[in-house]
Amino acid sequence: LSLRRQRQMCIRDSYDIYPDKAIERELYVSNTVGADQNNKMKKIGIFLEDMDHVTVDGNNSLFMFHGKMTTFATIGCEDVEFKNFAVDFQVPTVIDMTVESVEGNTATMYIPECYNYEVAGTTIKWYSDVSPYTGQRYWSISDLSGYHTQREDTVQGIKFGAGNGNAALKGVASIEDLGNHRVKITYNSKAGEVQNGMCFQSRPTVRDHAGTFFWKSKDIKMTSLDIQFLHGFGMVGQHSENITMEDVDFEAPKESGRTTAGYADFVQMSGCKGAININNCTFAGPHDDPINIHGTFNTVTSISSDRRTITVQYNHHETAGFPNFFEGDEIEFMTKGNMITVENSVRTVTKVDGPDGMGGNMGEGSGSLTTIKLTLDKAIPADVQVNQHVVENITYTPAVNISNCEFKEVPTRGILVTTRKPIVIENNTFDGMSMAGIYISDDAQGWYESGPVRDVTIRNNTFTRGNAQAIFIEPTNPTVSTEKTVHSNIKIKGNTFFTYNKRVLDAKSVDNLTFKNNKIYRQDPINGDGSLS
């Protein structure tokens, strides 16, 4: 569904949206498939392009998507609101199966009704639904061994991001289809993870689509949405300004028997500016981080003789192909080794030659999806050297407010955020995080997710049943400067921590760190229900 002229779209009831008739575009999205040409084409269900002042009001409708696709997207839009609807997939691309009973070396597994499957000897084949246009299935998988599998203890509400992988289908002697979406698995040797209430969640590892996508857009708002499943890589905001989420709940429907609502991250804001406001939202059942807000470092690979023109490159294989800089943007250089900013290195971009994000070129781009040439207003400092320094677009760094949200059933971190603009994280609950509840990094070694924080307030949050540090501040600087810090001005006040053997705070390379008026309680790990010993 492509919207170009309408200014308001009000709909009601349930709608099936198929990739067969969807808009298709070549797009390059941060943290997904990088320059991979096998996955450059994106199917988009609801697509707004170059439109302003639009409201998409679902009137409590359900949008049921099929196959693999982006649910809704804006490109070059301003003042757009999506509200009052639910999003789900007919057959989610994450396969959930839950242990109902265990007896000796056998286990009975429940497979939710949305999945199509067939027992084949000692394995199970899985199928999508059938296209009404072609009569063909959108996808099928005959063996989950190549999938990434996580586990969720549905009794305790705790998710495990690592361990014995798909233990449910290891050491299998036989599988019997019992009907009614139950299978009986007999094991030669049953793994300890196969126990009552354990849900095994298996997904592909290729992020071929974004779940939703907002690019070169401004003043985007999502209100009262139920995100029951997103295929691919969550809600991605890329080089957009002012994105607001109010009462957006990410959670599989209780009656569905499923436990997974997201293929990877739920919310990924990459290189945005203005304000990112996330309020009164629920994040339950992702396969990666619920919220990740960051910029992107590019490594300096060449410098002209007058030091006014530089070539930079993308470094991680999942990020490439889109413009990370625009004329008029300010940039700043950092040293890769210690992650310290280079003094007096802020410059203004006057020309960009590189990929345009749609398979073409900006300026006199070479056609490379991984390199960008920048012309600057004046020469860069002599300290900046090839392959030793990275550059960040500091124009596209947002202020962030995350408040009154609930994070649960998470296999990774709750919130990742790195931006130099003010950050406020308040009145949230973090339950059972497998890793840190709040993680502040700044990375020019692996993901190249920038940048330093300068003003952070973490207050009045509650952390329970965490399996790691509640708050973790760790830039990935292999060399720690003895003169300067990467981060500064972090205030942690009025929070409540329930823990049994983990740190509530672990910090590195921070100037002016305040930890004040917080309450720390010893939690009973045996009860596992938040009660105290």
Question: Which stretches of residues belong to each language-model region?
Answer:
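Single conserved hydrophobic/aromatic residue that forms the stacking wall/gate
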Residues: 1-7, 11
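Extracellular beta-strand-rich solenoid/capping regions of secreted or surface-exposed proteins
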Residues: 5, 16-55, 64-83, 91-106, ...
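Short "repeat-start/strand-capping" segments in structured domains, especially the N-termini
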Residues: 52, 77-81, 217-221, 238-244, ...
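Ser/Thr/Gly-rich low-complexity blocks that favor extended beta-strand/coil architectures
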Residues: 65, 89-90, 114-175, 320-367
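Short glycine/acidic-rich loop motifs that flank beta-strands on beta-rich extracellular proteins
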Residues: 65-71, 91-95, 209-211, 231-236, ...
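Small/polar beta-strand repeat architecture
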Residues: 155-207, 345, 351-400, 408
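Alpha-solenoid helical-repeat scaffolds
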Residues: 157-257, 265-269, 276, 280-282, ...
